[in-house]
Amino acid sequence: MHSYTVEPLYVKSGQEVIAADFYRPKTENKPAVIIMAHGLAALRQFKLVQYAKRFAQAGYAVVLFDYRYWGRSTGRPRELVSLTSQLEDWRTMIAHILERKSIDTRRIVLWGTSLSGGYALNLAAELKNVQAIMVQVPFVDGTESAKLYSLQQLPKALKISSQDYMGAKVGMSPKTLPVVDKNGLCFMPTADSYDGYLSIVNPDYFWSGEIPARVFFNLIRYRPIQDARNISVPVLFIASKQDSLIPMESSRETATNIAPFVQYHEWDMQHFDIYHGQWFEKAISTQLEFLHQHIGVN
């Protein structure tokens, strides 16, 4: 087990500054690096630190960052989710890592969960300087996930999303939707999502629980599954059989599209279980084994 340090890292991305934690293991050789960020509307302190620590103890450098508009990263309005901007933040962090002389830039790994798992799949299909990716319960097909909404909910969500988008064009304050809600309209409307999402929230950090609604329209059109055939690096893909947010068939189809480069797992858990207890331990051990096989150890 390696000791490590954690250093604050601030990187310019567009007109904003991205805040990150840089986990640096104490090793004789330059370590491989894992770049990590969270899913929809989540901060890096929402259960991702436990992953970063375990990777660093295993000898891997880790860059764990918050998107613009979130956490200590800059940008307004606060808590805005922009798929385009968040993908650009990923590209910025990768470009920054390529310039650091203290790590092995030939061994860059992307790690994503839920929505950021979709980002990792997109980037693996797009970029040539990524050596492997690891995704858990990834968001792969917004068109299919949109079918989770009832016929009463979907038009309402689209209406609020459109109102927020048009209002932003003329400088109006954002119209927001809850990320989760037990009874009302929200981004994650399934029965287990309310308790599941709140189980990862860190009460030591500000989180309003609502985000500007404009992203809803983009989410239901976001389909990383379409780019999966262009991936030619090793992929660890962990799906959950009881996932109420990510249709199982969409995960299976995505994995089929990535073959033969994918190591695919289906576990009998719900979407948010992977951050806790036995499922976290199983996930981290599986991920470390994958890294050992495809990236090596220090």
Task: Please place each PLM-identified region on the residue numbering.
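N-terminal cap/lid segment of alpha/beta-hydrolase-fold proteins
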Residues: 1-29, 277
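Catalytic nucleophile-loop/oxyanion-hole region of alpha/beta-hydrolase
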Residues: 14, 44, 70-105, 277-283
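Alpha/beta-hydrolase-fold enzymes
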Residues: 121-203
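Short beta-strand/loop motif that positions the catalytic acidic residue
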Residues: 231, 237-239, 243
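Conserved alpha/beta-hydrolase "acid-adjacent" motif
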Residues: 244-250
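Catalytic active-site module of serine/aspartate enzymes centered on a nucleophile-bearing elbow/loop
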Residues: 267-298
